[in-house]
UniProtKB/Swiss-Prot annotation:
Cysteine disulfide partners in this protein: none
Keyword Transmembrane helix: yes
Keywords for this protein: Cell membrane, Membrane, Transmembrane, Transmembrane helix
Its membrane topology: Multi-pass membrane protein
Naturally occurring in which organism (per UniProt): Shewanella baltica (strain OS155 / ATCC BAA-1091)
Major place of residence: membrane
Annotated compartments: Cell membrane
HAMAP family: UPF0114 (MF_00143)
Keyword Protein transport set for record: no
Protein name, entry field: UPF0114 protein Sbal_0780
Cellular component GO terms held in the UniProt record: plasma membrane
Short name of any one Pfam family annotated for the protein: UPF0114
Length: 164
């Protein structure tokens, strides 16, 4: 009975596989939004102001960072919790594939969230005249929380890895 239960539990990790595959659909949706923004920009390139262009650029960078985060979670999550990716050993293989454990994945995700939050906060500051001070304060507090959380997670990971 115990062996059957353990095998069933171990096999249940495959439930995560379609979820990781579903993230690729979100990645596709982000790509569509990215190019939609570019196609809206092109006809108006000579009419758009500098600040609006910078805000749009920050939005595109934001989408790119989120896309990178999705790729990182998709691949390393699949490798850590479902099965090893067998993509061959050619030049196309990502250098970090197979080398990122759950702890380092958490740190990379936290760093990505801080970067995304930084871009969003920069967009808020560039548009500060249209945003209430209360909202700016909350954006700043949330960003500081992300930064402190990422720092704490990195520090705890360092402590557990060194055993000190």
């Amino acid at each position: 009975m115990e062996k059957v239960f353990e095998r069933l539990m171990y096999a249940s990790r495959w439930i995560m596989a379609p979820i990781y595959l579903g993230l690729s659909l979100i990645l596709f949706a982000l790509g569509v939004k990215f190019f939609q923004e570019i196609f809206h920009l092109l006809p108006n390139i000579f009419k758009i102001g500098e600040v609006d262009l910078v805000l749009l650029t920050l939005s595109l960078i934001d989408i790119t960072l989120v896309g990178g985060l999705i790729v990182m979670v998709m691949f390393s999550g699949y490798e850590n919790f479902v099965s090893q990716l067998d993509v061959g050993e050619d030049n196309d293989k990502l250098s970090w594939l197979g080398k990122m454990d759950a702890g380092s994945l958490k740190n990379k995700v936290a760093a990505s969230i801080v970067a995304i939050s930084s871009i969003h906060l920069l967009k808020v500051f560039m548009n500060a005249e249209n945003i209430s001070n209360d909202k700016i304060m909350w954006y700043l507090l949330i960003h500081i929380t992300f930064v402190l959380s990422a720092f704490a997670m990195g520090y705890l990971d360092k402590i557990t890895r060194t055993g000190k």
